[in-house]
UniProtKB/Swiss-Prot annotation:
The J domain is necessary and sufficient to stimulate DnaK ATPase activity. Zinc center 1 plays an important role in the autonomous, DnaK-independent chaperone activity of DnaJ. Zinc center 2 is essential for interaction with DnaK and for DnaJ activity. It comes from the Bacteria. A zinc finger (CR-type) spans 130-212. It is found in: Cytoplasm. Participates actively in the response to hyperosmotic and heat shock by preventing the aggregation of stress-denatured proteins and by disaggregating proteins, also in an autonomous, DnaK-independent fashion. Unfolded proteins bind initially to DnaJ; upon interaction with the DnaJ-bound protein, DnaK hydrolyzes its bound ATP, resulting in the formation of a stable complex. GrpE releases ADP from DnaK; ATP binding to DnaK triggers the release of the substrate protein, thus completing the reaction cycle. Binds 2 Zn(2+) ions per monomer. This is Chaperone protein DnaJ 2. Residues 358-367 have a biased composition (Polar residues). PROSITE patterns: DNAJ_1, DNAJ_2, ZF_CR. GO terms for cellular component: cytoplasm. InterPro entries: DnaJ, DnaJ_C, DnaJ_domain, DnaJ_domain_CS, HSP40/DnaJ_pept-bd, HSP_DnaJ_Cys-rich_dom, HSP_DnaJ_Cys-rich_dom_sf, J_dom_sf. The gene is dnaJ2. Its cofactor is Zn(2+).
Amino acid sequence: MATDYYAVLGVRRDASQDEIKKAFRRLARELHPDVNPDPKTQERFKEINAAYEVLSDPQKKQVYDLGGDPLSQAAGGGAGGFGAGGFGNFSDIMDAFFGTASQRGPRSRTRRGQDAMIRIEVELDEAAFGTTKDIQVDTAVVCNTCNGEGAAPGTSAQTCDMCRGRGEVSQVTRSFLGQVMTSRPCPQCQGFGTVVPTPCPECAGDGRVRSRRTLTVKIPAGVDNGTRIQLAGEGEVGPGGGPAGDLYVEIHELPHSTFQRRGDDLHCTVTIPMTAAALGTKVPLETLDGMEEVDIRPGTQSGQSIPKHGRGVTHLRGGGRGDLIVHVEVTTPGKLDPEQERLLRELAKLRGEERPTGQFQPGQQGLFSRLKDAFNGR
């Protein structure tokens, strides 16, 4: 290092900015050409000015402390510098080493906000035909006190004095290739290029506050469990008053007491006595469209399904609706009085069903009996 700037000002290497400033002012009053016209004193005055220029600037001081001389490029390169003759400033040096790396510039304080999600419950008929619902959401909104700027009323953001608004600072590192200058986001302004000296008291400088709002959501016909409805721009407002993200409304369909939904079809079960199954009947059923009758034809068997077309859920995409599938369950009486038993026996006799058709008939051998006879040689 060609010049010890700390020695020039007579301060320690860990001196504060206030100590550096006081030392410079004291020497400047003593060595100013108007006070002391001696030529040697004038050279000394130039030295303290150069030392103060470096040590009072956090960026230049950092470069100097890491082994570089931030003033060397002004003289076309020096013994302890980069030999950077022809470069106008640090940006020129960065361009030479890293191309466009130093042209990133400060990042914007205004950024898009995050998306938000809320889950709402709907009844089956609401999902089938569509509806509108008022929902309450708690998201970040623009602070009305500072209009998203983050600064207290009557104040504004100021250019960062560490990076001079560039959003990044340069530093010198030593490697086997020699001294290399690199850049990184400014630690004082976090890369924004500006700082907020007096933050807004309402949002603490963030530019956003939490707020509960009421929104009206249109639920389209045909939504199902897990369907997400996107509300553009209704999510979290971004930092610095940036545009809001989107709000996603996730549908949770509540179970129905009668119907089970499978896709756009609805399923239900009706229970009828065996006499109704044999003779046929009409069963009243409350559907999504109101009271209707299910036509049970004579001879209907337990487990048989009867479709009612177009009585299901509206198709979410395209027209039309799914079906209502009615499953029939036939019950058998568990206890009969003597008269009922007599009548059933008479019916069985008339139908030739005194002996159950599935009963094992005498003289017939089962599989295991035949295998046993074969093993015994019979």
